[in-house]
Amino acid sequence: MGRTYIVEETVGQYLSNINLQGKAFVSGLLIGQCSSQKDYVILATRTPPKEEQSENLKHPKAKLDNLDEEWATEHACQVSRMLPGGLLVLGVFIITTLELANDFQNALRRLMFAVEKSINRKRLWNFTEEEVSERVTLHICASTKKIFCRTYDIHDPKSSARPADWKYQSGLSSSWLSLECTVHINIHIPLSATSVSYTLEKNTKNGLTRWAKEIENGVYLINGQVKDEDCDLLEGQKKSSRGNTQATSHSFDVRVLTQLLLNSDHRSTATVQICSGSVNLKGAVKCRAYIHSSKPKVKDAVQAVKRDILNTVADRCEMLFEDLLLNEIPEKKDSEKEFHVLPYRVFVPLPGSTVMLCDYKFDDESAEEIRDHFMEMLDHTIQIEDLEIAEETNTACMSSSMNSQASLDNTDDEQPKQPIKTTMLLKIQQNIGVIAAFTVAVLAAGISFHYFSD
């Protein structure tokens, strides 16, 4: 038996309202959450057409020649940045004027694998063996309204299609629990002199990958308590007269404890690394995750929070490097420091839902630009007054110094002078020196943790 997809009714209305306007097809993304028993779809969004495609797509004879995988995968990557923890791009859809043919299903299959590969390439985390590895393709014939729903195993490029059930349900968007936390980070990334061929972006990602292990191995307090991962998240909540568990609050406070010292099983000798500089990433970020309220497990909730922490930090660094590349900012002299504004997080309510999506705003961007970007990427209208700015401006400091000092310095006094309440500071220090990167084995039986939250 194939998987079952429980779909918010408004998604069905959205798909029905898409007008082909003489085009051969319209494609897009399906967004929601996987669970062991079934998947939940709460949002569908069409891929915005390229301007140069507007004329070509009006001719049905073009068929699938105009299904631009590169454009569709770029859209998927942009949308993936806007999803909080717990939500994923579950698959792709296509609405056509033609009856189902193998060409359409093959094209959908290729598109689905391309989208998944593109999104996964930028993640700091990997799916576990226990997680659902199937993704969905949905084909709708505009003339007959017939639906063809199939899934593929993303871990097997040669997997064949499996039929799946597509069921609409009202009120799905209100059946979600939220988890919120503020995470303070202080990441030091040495830039190896032997890896000069690596770009700054690649070096930074390598450093973030090491930091990600700390987040993965952290201890997570939910409403101040450490809970067994196999417990029900709503355990201890009041029950209704019908015996159903009712959450007294739809929001949970999460705090993170990261391991400060290693135990004796992780002995390591000191290593010396020749470095040309270093990157320091410091500050606080607001994180938010959502999980469906149907028998939620603690481990699923914690996993959603972990992934939101990793995603939001990695996405901001990537956006900063993209901005620097696009604007072609000239390098400063060796003795000068350079400050750049990192994007800060803005949450946006999904219309008719308790779930909030997010976007990122640079300091020189207006609220109108964020609204327009949201509408372009997700094809849904929002109001400017609904934007929730969760953070203060985050600032990046890039400095260059050709002296021979060690780069394991304290940068607290080198932050910008303007008042910043919630700051993510990225300091890039260029120098000719030696960094002693070492790990000390701890013989004590206990494990120390560093309090890593607000």
Swiss-Prot record:
Its main location: membrane. Keywords: Membrane, Transmembrane, Transmembrane helix. The keyword Transmembrane applies. Ubiquitously expressed. InterPro entries: ODR-4-like. It is found in: Membrane. The keyword Membrane applies. GO terms for biological process: protein localization. It comes from the Eukaryota. It is a multi-pass membrane protein. The chain crosses the membrane at residues 82-102, 432-452. One of its GO terms (cellular component) is membrane. Belongs to the ODR-4 family. May play a role in the trafficking of a subset of G-protein coupled receptors. This is Protein odr-4 homolog. It comes from Homo sapiens.
